């Protein structure tokens, strides 16, 4: 994913009103399920995600393959 698409997609999903959970799919197969908007901070193509339990995950646009929809729709 390119840097501009990454920044735009993350910000769009993070700031939806009302907030809806979304998934960030990494190129290595890891999936980050963002269920709270403040669990994710984004700046200049890099992001910090706080996974359940407060575990920090640092990643950038080069490691992301897709940012996708609403987790609730898949249950």
What residues fall within each predicted segment?
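Motif-centric detector for short Cys/His coordination patterns
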Residues: 1-75
